[in-house]
Amino acid sequence: MIDFDGYRPNVGIVICNKAGQVLWAKRFGQNSWQFPQGGINEGENIETAMYRELYEEVGLTKKDVRLLWASKYWLKYKLPKRLVRSDGSQLVCIGQKQRWFLLQLLSDENLIDLKTTKSPEFDGWRWVSFWYPVRQVVSFKRDVYRKVMKEFAGVLLNESKKPETVEKPRVERTEKRDFQKRDNQKREFRKSARMWNNSHQKGKAQ
């Protein structure tokens, strides 16, 4: 499917592990590496397309990951002239427009499978540092990768700073009330003692 501007709607997927590294995949039969990505079918929901591509390209399902973020806007890149092609109609694909997703791997990495289809996209993968792909991806995708990773970096930073929610034990509030009660009792006792002492001294004087 190609839009009237010549761009093919596409989803891109960044998968991170708990160490903050990202999954970097090698294109089948090539010395070219990239993030998983794939086209959106006509009438297909963007998120549905993402989970479909996730399974087709790396063998993971929705239960294996946690969706951390989805880019709000389309990001475009143009293809080099040698890669420009027609879809069989009068429309010519001049590039991709992409919506990107940041996922955190929850399952064991051994579940990653590059051979779920008869025509796999990748024949190898590895974990790399977060910014590594921006420097290593093919030049015509580099600007999109830079924007995506800049947006996702803020998301991961916020994730790492999230404190664990710990409810203050109810006993602490109870103890605080008990201390206040004892303080009030002490003040009342001292007040009564002074009144009794004054009254006793007056009785002696009489």
UniProtKB/Swiss-Prot annotation:
Span of domain Nudix hydrolase: 6-150
Name of protein: RNA pyrophosphohydrolase
Short sequence motif named Nudix box, residue ranges: 38-59
Protein purpose: Accelerates the degradation of transcripts by removing pyrophosphate from the 5'-end of triphosphorylated RNA, leading to a more labile monophosphorylated state that can stimulate subsequent ribonuclease cleavage.
UniProt family annotation: Belongs to the Nudix hydrolase family. RppH subfamily.
InterPro entries according to UniProt: Nudix_hydrolase, NUDIX_hydrolase-like_dom_sf, NUDIX_hydrolase_CS, NUDIX_hydrolase_dom, RppH
Domain of life of the native organism: Bacteria
Enzyme class: hydrolase
GO cellular component, one term: cytoplasm
Cystine crosslinks: none
Keyword Hydrolase: yes
Gene3D superfamilies cross-referenced by the UniProt entry: Nucleoside Triphosphate Pyrophosphohydrolase
Pfam families reported in the protein's UniProt record: NUDIX (PF00293)
GO molecular function, one term: mRNA 5'-diphosphatase activity
Protein's GO biological process: mRNA catabolic process
Alphabetic keyword roster: Hydrolase
Cofactor(s) needed: a divalent metal cation
Enzyme Commission number(s) of this protein: 3.6.1.-
NCBIfam families, A to Z: PRK00714.1-1, PRK00714.1-4, PRK00714.1-5
Compositional bias (Basic and acidic residues): 162-191
Region of interest (Disordered), residue spans: 162-206
